[in-house]
Amino acid sequence: MTVSPNTAEQAYLDLCKRIIDEGEHRPDRTGTGTKSLFAPPQLRFDLSNDTFPLLTTKKVFSKGIIHELLWFVAGSTDAKILSEKGVKIWEGNGSREFLDKLGLTHRREGDLGPVYGFQWRHFGAEYKDCDSDYTGQGFDQLQDVIKKLKTNPYDRRIIMSAWNPPDFAKMALPPCHVFCQFYVNFPTSSPDPNNPKQAKTAKPKLSCLLYQRSCDMGLGVPFNIASYALLTKMIAHVVDMDCGEFIHTLGDAHVYLDHIDALKEQFERIPKQFPKLVIKEERKNEIKSIDDFKFEDFEIVGYEPYPPIKMKMSV
């Protein structure tokens, strides 16, 4: 038996297998049915040296991950903006039929309501529609995270949450990836505030811990892992840090019944080394704010996955 050097991806595959073998059979909102475990062991991914945890045992839609994250960061909630870029992952939840089923008959197609991006950038603002300008409204959690990392990196409140119960009735889908916390490790000795001239041997390392309440292991989780790894990378660049780890805490970790055969095919594959994701050299000095990033700024190097495996999204 060949043992993969990529223990992080193997841990993900082993968890999927355990859910299929031991999980409880449960009905679900979509009507598809799942096998589910609650609060399995965390998944951990090393992000140092530009490592990017994009699964290798199937080709993952990296274009979709980058575009969706930039869409969150922009505070956008309009699925049509993503669709126009060839990223159709939100079309089901933004369709006329789906919105009408939720009673959101007044909402135009593609308007998802106050979902992730709105909560990240305008928490507490009153949501009208996806075409309104919310500049200066609500609380900008993402900028608050960045400010704390720059001014008080030891803070234990460096947190961003998409969980806002009063807004649920307006959302096409309440958040699955709910809440993340950032933590800074300082190399060797901690910086001495009384000695500003102290030599810095290396940059501090930024790590991210995500709590995800609902974890679609086959289709969604590979996306979420890469997305939060990329978010950590972007924030680290803006605050002049290196990346440490991404730690993924899962609540209801489930495999949809119609994904089991596809995952069994994936289990036969031996994980390869993760690729690297770099910010293009010519743009590094130009990107000073989290809002400066563009799709073209990122380059994924050394990604040699196995072929794609089709899995249907349950809406």
Curated annotation (Swiss-Prot):
Pathway of action: Pyrimidine metabolism; dTTP biosynthesis
Family matches, as HAMAP family: Thymidy_synth_bact
The organism's taxonomic lineage, starting at the top: Eukaryota, Fungi, Dikarya, Ascomycota, Saccharomycotina
Cellular component, GO annotation: cytosol; fungal biofilm matrix; mitochondrion
EC number, UniProt record: 2.1.1.45
Classification via InterPro entries: Thymidate_synth/dCMP_Mease (IPR045097), Thymidate_synth/dCMP_Mease_dom (IPR023451), Thymidate_synth/dCMP_Mease_sf (IPR036926), Thymidylate_synthase (IPR000398), Thymidylate_synthase_AS (IPR020940)
One GO biological process term: dTTP biosynthetic process
Coiled-coil annotated spans: none
Reaction(s) catalysed (UniProt annotation): dUMP + (6R)-5,10-methylene-5,6,7,8-tetrahydrofolate = 7,8-dihydrofolate + dTMP
Binding sites annotated in the UniProt record for (6R)-5,10-methylene-5,6,7,8-tetrahydrofolate: D216
Protein name: Thymidylate synthase
Record-linked Pfam families: Thymidylat_synt
GO molecular function: FMN binding; phosphopantothenoylcysteine decarboxylase activity; protein phosphatase inhibitor activity; thymidylate synthase activity
Binding-site residues for dUMP, renumbered to this chain: R29, R156, R157, R213, S214, C215, D216, N224, H254, V255, Y256
SUPFAM superfamilies the UniProt entry points to: Thymidylate synthase/dCMP hydroxymethylase
